[in-house]
Amino acid sequence: MSTKNKKAAGGNGGAPKQTRQQSHDSQDYSSFKTVLFYCMLIVFLPVLTFFVLKGFVLDQFLNISEVKVNIASAVGAVVALHIALGLYIYRAYFGAPGSKGSKTD
């Protein structure tokens, strides 16, 4: 059998290559899910924090002017944004357990 026929027949070298590709695909998908989660957290957490603080917490329970309510809600949103960014940076710097990549040639 010629070399050309062995490759077409799916010789023994195809299985490790396929599992390696699946491993890379699963790592890429896991990375994508992580980045997507943190992007959504960074975008939506401050907005949600602003409106929750403004609409439910500060307006309902505290008797302060609307300008002060807006300022306090904005400060809360900025704090929430910094927390989300800090979580992302912590995860990016220290990584998830078992995420150490190994070099393969």
Curated annotation (Swiss-Prot):
Write the protein's name: Vacuolar ATPase assembly integral membrane protein VMA21 homolog
What residues form the membrane-spanning segments? 37-57, 69-89
Question: What InterPro entries does this protein map onto?
Answer: Vma21
Function noted in UniProt: Required for the assembly of the V0 complex of the vacuolar ATPase (V-ATPase) in the endoplasmic reticulum.
Give membrane topology per the record. Answer: Multi-pass membrane protein
- Region entry Disordered, spans: 1-26
Regarding protein family, the annotation reads: Belongs to the VMA21 family.
Q: Does the keyword Membrane apply?
A: yes
Task: Please give the GO cellular component terms listed in this UniProt entry.
Answer: endoplasmic reticulum membrane; endoplasmic reticulum-Golgi intermediate compartment membrane; ER to Golgi transport vesicle membrane
Pfam families documented for this protein = VMA21 (PF09446)
Q: Name one GO biological process term.
A: vacuolar proton-transporting V-type ATPase complex assembly
Subcellular location per UniProt equals:
Endoplasmic reticulum membrane; Endoplasmic reticulum-Golgi intermediate compartment membrane; Cytoplasmic vesicle, COPII-coated vesicle membrane
Domain of life, source organism: Eukaryota
Keyword vocabulary terms for this entry: Cytoplasmic vesicle, Endoplasmic reticulum, Membrane, Transmembrane, Transmembrane helix
Q: Which residues lie on this side of the membrane: Lumenal?
A: 58-68
Instruction: Give ranges for the Cytoplasmic compartment.
Output: 1-36, 90-105
